[in-house]
Amino acid sequence: TGDSKGQHHFLDTSLYEKSILATWKKLNLPKLPLICLTQSHECNNKSSLIHMFKTLNGKYLINSSGEINFEKINSFFKHNNSPIVFAGTALAFLELIKNSSNINIELPNGSWVLETGGYKGMKKSVNKDTFYAEISELFNLPIDKIINEYSMTELSSQFYSFGLNHTHKSAHWLKAKVVIPGKNTEAQDGEKGILAIYDLANLGSSVAIMTGDIAIKKGNEFELVGRDETLTPRGCSLAAEELISRHI
């Protein structure tokens, strides 16, 4: 799947859904209502990210056309007093930041933000440190309450990290190696390379995936750096940006 939009053909999605729920439980991720800055599964049933949010019983704040409805967002947060996980693609959150004068969002104490999809798009890109600082300021949220979900269409499982400069963790059936490009050897501790991922939940498809993402080896884990800039940008943020751009 070398195009900007990948494909992953499942016999059925039951194992994918079990992997999502088991990983969430194993990593003790927040047991809170999930509010999603995406379309609903009924509007977009081809997105692995939206299917993940559906599996986690998410509620959605972007309408069927893909437009961010600031009035709907403001209304939800005005009437919500309970902690939540506010989830979406990085580029959808960037759109909120850009339009911060149009929104009045106060996340209740105990809330989290979950972002995913990468920070580089067709029209915009951002440094992760800057992005997290802006998220923290917009929502009055400590940076260590921001979760990054790292996965891709080609995988059935997910990695998660908390805040900045922390390694990504997952369940025991998902492993990653940081590989030196062109040498086919594993990087030394602290060394950069390309991520190779092995997902045993990929029953019926490829267990081993060579990504185009750069990471630093940290023991048996890794710290994600970002996509190799010489390669075509990919990720859920691109799909979100494409939808949002139609209404700008």
What are these language model-derived features?
Residues 1-9:
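Conserved adenylation A10 loop of the ANL superfamily
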Residues 8-28:
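Conserved structural elements of the adenylate-forming
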Residues 16, 45, 92-95:
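Short phosphate-engaging motifs
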Residues 20, 49, 96-100:
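Hydrophobic packing residues within well-ordered alpha-helices of enzyme cores
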Residues 25, 29-33, 55-248:
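Active-site glycine/GP-rich loop and adjacent strand/helix microenvironment
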Residues 38-43:
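Conserved Walker A/P-loop ATP-binding site and its immediately adjacent core
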Residues 45-57:
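Hydrophobic alpha-helical segments in the ANL/AMP-binding
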